[in-house]
Swiss-Prot record:
PANTHER family reported for this sequence: ARGININE--TRNA LIGASE, CYTOPLASMIC, ARGINYL-TRNA SYNTHETASE
Catalyzed reactions per annotation: tRNA(Arg) + L-arginine + ATP = L-arginyl-tRNA(Arg) + AMP + diphosphate
Listed PROSITE patterns: AA_TRNA_LIGASE_I
Cellular compartments annotated: Cytoplasm
InterPro entries membership: aa-tRNA-synth_I_CS, Arg-tRNA-ligase, Arg-tRNA-synth_N, Arg-tRNA-synth_N_sf, ArgRS_core, DALR_anticod-bd, Rossmann-like_a/b/a_fold, tRNAsynth_Ia_anticodon-bd
Keywords carried by this UniProt record: Aminoacyl-tRNA synthetase, ATP-binding, Cytoplasm, Ligase, Nucleotide-binding, Protein biosynthesis
Organism field: Xanthobacter autotrophicus (strain ATCC BAA-1158 / Py2)
Primary location group: cytoplasm
GO molecular function: arginine-tRNA ligase activity; ATP binding
Family indicated by similarity: Belongs to the class-I aminoacyl-tRNA synthetase family.
Entry EC number(s): 6.1.1.19
Pfam families recorded: Arg_tRNA_synt_N, DALR_1, tRNA-synt_1d
The protein's name in its UniProt record: Arginine--tRNA ligase
Subunit structure: Monomer.
């Protein structure tokens, strides 16, 4: 039950009635009409800009049109009054009959309250993490992993058919470096003193088990082979081992994928799909042989003064056409990405979301251009950039990990503070802003720790319900059973504030999904938790506001219905974020 969508329909009906009466012109564009909370809660429960955005085309002054619309809205059931403010803003106050309907919807729909049909089942591919399989996941990967997973959950809750995908970068030079690093550990496992790890190889201890496994399987035989012979075998073993570790790290964060896609699969096997994608674009005129002009200002990384295979990305808004082959004839990374995204289109994904590190920001335009080209303009690619995470402990920067050799691993962070703290705090700031993550602060049991504050609100609600079950043994235990309680008795200012917040959850879900901003969910939950804690604290000072009133069974049942509603929406939002809604704090 989306209150704002319901009243947006009422506004459209009011406008249609005015058209039918010949008061205003027909065929008005209602796309910019919104119904939202007023900036000042004292102005009412809802506000609309309808008159302000329609007045010119309607042929009336904004305030005159506002008064006409207000007159129609005033007859809607559940409306207490409608005011016109300033030049033509419309404020709507709801009466006491409306909020019980909203709360009853929360109680009967449970965790599905707020679930939206916004996506209408549209297929969307969300690709995230896609870390090189060259080492353990680190804290930088962690933020992108949590963001991507929460975004996928949010899109699913908003009605999209979501596929979660991981792109395994197993075809570049970095995996050959991985193989050479693993081979060094193989020699070490055979008893050879390898000394200090040479520059250019991966120094972490995480490849020691790979070397031991190779030694156990092959003995010294690999040492007798040339690099050309041993490298593919060692590379495959190292990648497989790293991907097992990556999957385990992601599982520790509560993250799983529907698809793991190998980059190497694009250029091996019976069909060279990278070459095929290039030739398809050549046939449509979007690939040509030519020379790039010398760079102006800042150097262009992949510029070479030679005849080369180029993609016409400037036709799609990019700054310069992009090379698809290197001077040695091998494909550029961009060419592989074109083929990969073409594969997504071929699988039926016309809506794609990629989650990348902020350092890839310069790559966005060319990739969006490529998606337009390979799909004939049918598909869209949205890219969400993830800023860096700075790790602290009690205000002091955290030093590198011994295991990885150069960074703090994701598993170390999860093991120290727990999955819930990591996930919630990674989502308590917009993804394009840097994040300071303090290992000590995220496990504090205080209101300054957002994850504790929100989880405690859910646990407090459950505690109230347990206490009520002892006081009133004959009251029902299931939330849905409270939908028939005398909910109209919820008329205290704090109770109405909570009801307004619950009513805004469906709208918030659609807004967050539309903007691809799961942090809005964590902000909403923190606000709901704050209002719930505030109402509980008011009851400490004013006994008549307590949730359990021993001598008033009806009022108690109404307030317990509200507690159930708060717990339900908190649990629903936490589920979208992939965070546990705990019943008791430990």
């Amino acid at each position: 039950m989306n209150v704002y969508a319901i009243f947006a329909d009422h506004v459209r009906e009011a406008v249609a009635a005015l058209v039918a009466e010949g008061i205003i012109a027909k065929d008005l564009d209602l796309a910019r009409v919104v119904v939202e909370p007023p900036r000042d809660a004292s102005h009412g429960d809802l506000a609309t800009n309808a008159a302000m955005v329609l007045a010119k085309d309607a042929g009336l002054k904004p305030r005159e049109l506002a008064e006409r619309i207000a007159g129609k809205l005033g007859t809607v059931a559940g409306v207490k009054k409608v005011d016109v403010a300033g030049p033509g803003f419309i404020n709507i106050a709801l009466d006491g009959t409306f909020w019980p309907v909203v709360l009853a919807a929360v109680l009967t729909q449970g965790l599905d309250f707020g679930r939206s049909a916004l996506g209408a089942g549209e297929k969307v591919n969300v690709e995230y993490v896609s870390a090189n399989p060259t080492g353990p996941m680190h804290v930088g990967h962690c933020r992108g992993a949590v963001f991507g997973d929460a975004l996928a959950r949010l899109m699913d809750f908003a009605g999209f058919a979501v596929t979660k995908e991981y792109y395994i970068n197993d075809a570049g030079a970095q995996v050959d470096v991985l193989a050479r690093s693993a081979f060094l550990r193989y020699r070490e496992a055979l008893g050879e003193a390898i000394g200090e790890i040479p520059e250019g190889l991966y120094p972490g201890d995480y490849l020691v088990p790979v070397g031991q496994k190779l030694a156990a399987a092959h003995g010294p035989a690999l040492k007798e082979k040339s690099e050309t012979d041993w490298l593919p075998l060692v590379r495959a073993e190292a990648i497989a081992t790293m991907m097992v570790a990556i999957r385990e790290d992601l599982a520790a964060l509560g993250i799983s994928f529907d698809v793991f896609f190998s980059e190497r699969s694009l250029s091996t096997g019976a069909v060279d799909r990278v070459g095929a994608a290039i030739e398809a674009l050549r046939a449509s005129g979007e690939v040509y042989e030519g020379r790039l002009p010398p760079p102006k200002g800042a150097p262009i990384e992949d510029w070479e003064d030679r005849e080369q295979t180029l993609f016409r990305s400037t036709d799609f808004g990019d700054d310069v056409d992009r090379p698809l082959k290197k001077s040695d004839g091998s494909y550029t990374y961009f060419a592989g990405d074109i083929a990969y995204h073409k594969d997504k289109v071929d699988r039926g994904f016309l809506k794609m979301i990629d989650v990348w590190g902020a350092d890839h920001g310069g790559y966005v335009k060319r990739m969006q251009a490529a998606v337009k080209a390979v799909s004939g303009g049918r598909a869209t690619l949205d890219v969400e950039l993830i800023q860096l995470v700075r790790l602290f402990r009690a205000g002091e920067p955290v030093r590198m990990s011994k295991r990885s050799g150069s960074f703090v691993t994701l598993r170390e962070v999860v093991d120290e503070v727990g999955r819930d703290a990591v996930r919630f705090m990674m989502l308590f700031r917009k993804n394009d802003a840097p994040l300071d993550f303090d290992l000590a602060k995220v496990i504090e049991q205080s209101r300054e720790n957002p994850v504790f504050y929100v989880q405690y609100a859910h646990a407090r609600a459950k505690s109230i319900l347990r206490n009520a079950a002892e006081e009133f043994a004959d009251l029902p235990q299931q939330a849905a059973s409270f939908a028939t309680a005398p909910l109209a008795r919820l008329d205290d200012e704090g109770e109405i504030t909570l009801l307004r917040r619950l009513a805004s959850w469906p709208r918030l879900v659609e807004q967050a999904a539309g903007a691809r901003e799961p942090h809005r969910i964590s902000f909403f939950l923190h606000e709901l938790a704050s209002e719930f804690h505030g109402q509980w604290n008011r009851g400490k000072d004013l006994p008549h506001l307590r949730f359990i009133i021993e001598n008033d069974r009806e009022l108690t049942s109404a307030r317990l219905a509200l507690v159930h509603g708060v717990a339900t929406v908190l649990a629903s939002g936490l589920k979208v974020l992939g965070v546990t809604a705990v019943d008791e704090m430990k």
